[in-house]
Amino acid sequence: MKTKNILAAFTLLAASLCPTMAQAQSDEAKMNTFIDNLMNKMTLKEKLGQLNLPVTGDIVTGQAKSSDVASKIKRGEVGGLFNLKGVEKIKEVQKIAVEQSRLHIPLLFGMDVIHGYETVFPIPFSLSCSWDMEAIKRTAQIAAQECSADGINWTFSPMLDICRDPRWGRMAEGSGEDPYLGSCIAKAMVEGYQGQNLAAPNTVMACVKHFALYGGAEAGRDYNTVDMSHWRMFNYYMPPYKAAVDAGALSVMTSFNVVDGVPATGNKWLLTDVLRKMWGFKGMVVTDYTAIQEMTAHGLGDLQQVSAMALNAGTDMDMVADGFLGTIEKSINEGKVTMETVNTACRRILEAKYKLGIFDDPYKYCNVKRAKKEIYTPQNRAFSREIAAKTFVLLKNEGNLLPLQRKGKIALIGPLADNSKNMSGTWSVVARLDDNKTILGSMKKALEGKAEVLYAKGSNLMYDAKREADATMFGREMRDSRSKEEMLKEALDVAQQADIIVAAVGESSEMSGECSSRTNLEMPDAQKDLLIALKKTGKPIVLVNFSGRATVMTWEQENFPAILNVWFGGCESGDAICDVLFGDKVPSGKLTATMPKSVGQIPLYYNHLNTGRPLKEGKWFSKFTSNYLDIDNDPLYPFGYGLSYTTFKYGKPTLSSNTMTNNETISVSVDITNTGNYDADEIAQMYIRDLAASVSRPVKELKGFERISIKKGETKTVTFTITPEDLKFYNQELEYKNEPGEFEVMVGPNSKDVQTLTFTLK
């Protein structure tokens, strides 16, 4: 009888699923019929036009410019356009495509909506430090809502490049050094952008970038060579890309770098064998800015040769270079490209347009009333303020100097204390820069009638004016014409009057980001001298540090009692920073990249291999072990680290079982008690180590985390489930599997301060 009930239930479940499956098959059949009919009418030039993605001059994100765009649209020689700002402008251009081209095919409209649209959220690296997947997903939803209201239907995000070298400026755009956390964020971002229904007017097509391995650039120098084994790339660099594909991302952008000596844009193994055959990706592949043209500089031939190579490799859309539009017809005539290859690429782009619903309604993203109502709303800005406070990482708080009291005189000093243009961070291309909240403005508001705020800029970003100009693209100039002596005197006069100093220093927004690699990750020279002078006053100093990457703060750690890393917090930065400084919010962010003591330690990451001659953690030099003569191996701050205004005590973890098989899971539980004086959030972390395997395995790997709210005096139990999947890795033959044997599971507040248990996989 029980068996009959189970069978009956299964039959009912299958029946309930059948309409959904049938509907999906019916929808796909309709799409295929529609596209077949359309492509039967298209000329070769019109098909190549769908593969063409020129740029407008509204927003500058690269060197090359497109020409004669309107005429090309009329001739059906453009598939999409990017960097056009404003719903009315976009509607005008869409009208040209729909009403003046022969086949009336609507355009895609793309933009780098990286961390918000006009409502700007913290930079992606900062967001990752919140470890809050629902909040991160919500930022993507709001970004999609705003940009789609302004005519955009395609965002070149999320950026999923794992980075172990903070000299690389584009660490700011990613989620740090860990593939597990990066994969969780990839899923959240794609789901946030695309939603449950890509044809809805408030969702946009996501674009996974930069595929692949861009974050592995040698020496951290942007656009530089990448060279790594397949074993390393599949274990550490590929997982976030795959997670985004699994989450349904409909487009992928190629990276500038080589993979196995072949530029990614022309790499058939990467774009066809891995992305499509191994991972099952069905969407469209677009190049990065002029990436096809740049293959000539890589030494792969002239524009015709590299264009054919890219198309044959699996690239579908050419951004800016005009290589496909201008050369592929000749390559077809010469037998170097087949018509089938062109048709396949064209179909993928038309499928994306169909799924977005713009064949049904080309103007669905062009509602002017919606743009006025849904962009930069008070609700969206309030959420930006809320999530920003969750991303800040408290690195040091000696003597509980923070939170500050609302009394007395506070000296706010530094080049980033009152500069709205640098609050939103890199790649905030349509931000309302002048409306961004500054620390000075927000602090005056927070302390009105309670305490006095004294302000001085103190210094420029750096002494060298040209180098400062190089680091302030997108018009974010902040240089003061006064002499360094004049600015320093003003700062010291202000400091002497105050009870406490808040120093707002660090990187400007464009000192990190694209083409912003640095060899020296310490505080810029002018600001370092300012801090030295302020320290000599003897006043207590809170360091508020801005950066788009992990920086070297060894001197600051040794010399200042309190350090709050605020990264770049978006349009509401000033309010969010003051929320944390004055205790309205309790800092809860934790590092997603290891912070080194010296740039000479880089690359430095927590999930490293042990080597045959490891130096024990916390030890200095030991002959014939893997170490340095002049510094220990340990980071300044480990991965996962971050303090709070309260304190948390971890109990002893327990395992549900000491053994598991590939058909079951086990769990590890730990009690966490808030032993301090503030209700606060804690981010508990679980790491796994495979003690004996067929290849060398990392000393630990993140495999679980939970952000949990705990009231003061309260104890909560956090339970992590360990699955067979958590124990899998790519072996030397690139087989993804786990192996029987002994494992360690570690639980704690960061990657260093953990408690360890062992279990066996049978």
What is each PLM-predicted segment?
Residues 1-26:
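Bacterial Sec-dependent N-terminal signal peptides
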Residues 22-728, 737-751, 760-762:
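Glycoside hydrolase catalytic-domain context in secreted enzymes
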